[in-house]
Amino acid sequence: MSDSAPNPFPVAWSDPRREAAFHDWLRQVAPAHALQPATVRPASADASFRRYLRIDGDAGSYIIMDAPPEREDCAPFVKVAGLMAAAGLNVPRVLAWDQPQGFMLLDDLGSRTMIEVVDAEPTPATQALYLRAVDALIAWQLASRPGVLPPYDEPLLARELALFPDWYLAKHRGLALTPEQRETLDAQFRLIMQRNLASPAVYVHRDFMPRNLMIPRDAAEPRLGVLDFQDAVHGPITYDIACLMRDAFLSWDEEFVLDITVRYWQKATKAGLPVDADFGEFYRGVEWMGLQRHLKVAGIFARLTLRDGKPKYLADAPRFIGYIRATANRYRELAPLARLVDQVEGSDAVTGFAFGRV
């Protein structure tokens, strides 16, 4: 089915008042863009309270964001979209926005995400896609300016790390930490934050992964489309490359992770970005940043299941625990975290790889 073909499944609305408000808004914006209201159908939903609809127009299809204002603030999306467009990234344009009601009309970048087209093995075609992602990331980071986006600071890092004991351990695993275990975890969290906050700061997408990168409809367009950027911050330069290569939904062997990461590092160095001059040190920073993200995401996915009724996300928990365990077992300073995770998960520890235990 093409992107412009009507979907046989109607759009469901749980709130009749919001449904009526949507149709009123759509009638107002339709003439300016030659929209066809009868073609509205679901496009996608994400882990938030936003959802996306697709609608046809005379010039092709468009995307509508449905973001209830009491649940979602669209202002950051609009701001970051402008920053990314100015940096030369391929992002959807905001064509119409009803801020009080949370309806937005956007360009349609396509229906195929990068995660849908990459091969199961790291083929040359897959490598080429990842290098296109690296190019987008470097363009984004080169546009960085302090004071424009919220800082990815210690309070934010601490709130994110707290999701692991609060939601993954306590609510998902049903584990009540002993005072000694809590003290150990807090000390490990302080160490993780200290290491990550030492990294130079740039613009950070925060979910820069194949699920949020789009394959352009136009084969001549070299830039991947970039989505889901509304939570962008100013923080560690190691974050987005860690997110790209230690994906929440896709795992790669260390050889491929190293290959793409070193290519990113080489391009970043040449572009003048503030990466460590030694790749080994830089990669260790990437691993420590990835560890923070995986602890956070394990907690978020538990919360999505237990609080928000979205159980599909927690199915990927073993991937995060594997990431956490691999990094914690590689670094001596993280041995207490490795032991705690092994106690919780009831599995033998893994050994380090690539750089070995350091």
Predicted regions, residues:
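Conserved N-terminal boundary motif of the eukaryotic protein kinase catalytic domain
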Residues: Q36-R41
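ATP-binding pocket architecture of kinase catalytic cores
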Residues: A43, S48-L157, A162-L163, L169-G174, ...
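Active-site acidic catalytic loop and adjacent metal/ATP-binding pocket
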Residues: F49-D56, I64, V94, F103-M104, ...
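Active-site activation/catalytic loop segments of kinase-like enzymes and analogous catalytic loops
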Residues: P165-H172, T238-P274, W288-D308, F320-T327
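ATP/Mg2+ or Mg2+-diphosphate-binding catalytic cores
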Residues: K296-V358
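An alpha-helical support segment within catalytic cores of ATP-dependent transferases
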Residues: F22, V29-P31, R145-P150, L156, ...
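Juxta-kinase regulatory segment immediately upstream of eukaryotic protein kinase catalytic domains
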Residues: S2-H33
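Secondary-structure capping and boundary motifs in well-ordered enzyme cores
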Residues: L129, H205, Q230-I237, Y283-L291
